[in-house]
């Protein structure tokens, strides 16, 4: 008869210990200590170099977050994955960086307090797990109470990657933070955190395991006691059985996992969630359901009874993120009409009938500064819907910030923000020299080392741009003896040589010899360069290394398969 009492005592002790530990937040990150050391060294150095922006602005970079201030028309915030939070107060004609000199440049999410929009919550650390390349980590949560003029770090330093911040609709000091955690290791600090005192203390209110982070969280505006959240098993891969949808009915203190028709297989991926502004029982999720054909993984489900049962809203497949749902899975509802749904992926899927049918947003695109792109850029990261005017949208994607005042019939591209995520840069031998670089999904560009004047377009130009207004530029460099000959590459080993005078390029990607047994494999960003000893000689490498003596017109295989062990028994 004493065993149940003993068991209850043990469980109570475990739970109490967890609550105490959660209240203490997280341990300090070594990244923050490194930043503090850097600040000390910089302040004591006699060589404090001042940096100036030289561009480019014609292409922009991946805008991870966009948020508007409904109380101040014309005020918009845009956060970029590779760096900084920018603010405009004139509908995007001019922008100012407002997150300078902080311990992290990479940003995962930004949220304005609905009841006090000058209070801004910011989560650092890029919120997407790129299996193929570097992802910038963060140093916790920051808060500003003056519209971004000053900032305080509020802890959660060991989060590394923050997926979402949600602020209470009437209390700016209550917020939830969805923490992805460390992408490349197990980590006990994954999960959902809550603060009730403006970030002074934190509670770890939803935790699954050290492989599963929290991805998204929404508070029902009509009843803030109702909170929905999603978890994402993001280590070691990008899917798992612990990915799911959760609900709290007491403001986030206790949680239960929802089922009733939702995908729950071993390959459930990233999940986004949106709740009706008027009905806390009506909720939508966008699921990267890798349990089915990966090209058809994007699925929208809806509940009208608070999560007891769910139904897939559409019969036709969406095809908005084939095989790369780890990049997307964000879903939004019109605050005035919960039958109007936006699902983000490579394209924006739009429904006005509760998700039963979807079309793709496109429309004509105009640029603030000259740009040859004619279409809306791909790969959409966040959408803001003006609650006072649902025709007014702002979207952040791999091409930057776009706004529309007619629900996507026409778009304005705000390519007047000097940001870019460069894989690599190089310079030629001219005097003055030109700079070349390949960017993350914003093509290959070149331009002068000249300080940019925000009132004017810069002098940068494209070496190459794909048909969808972007493309990963990777390595870009000029022939050291002929600056009119430029070499550039794009994802997965593609390589080209361009004659700038003629404006023409040719593919020079190497191929394995005919009849050769084996298969060439390439990293997303493939090593590719000119020999420092002979400007005609090129090298290109994947699991095989190739050498060209004639600018890429021909190639010779100079290595075995480097992905295979030289020991036949291994």
Task: Give the ranges of each region predicted by the language model.
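Bacterial N-terminal signal peptides that target proteins for export
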Residues: 1-9
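Bacterial N-terminal signal peptides
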Residues: 8-18
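Bacterial Sec-dependent signal peptides at the C-terminal "C-region" and cleavage site
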Residues: 16-26
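Beta-propeller blade termini and top-face loops
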Residues: 24-570
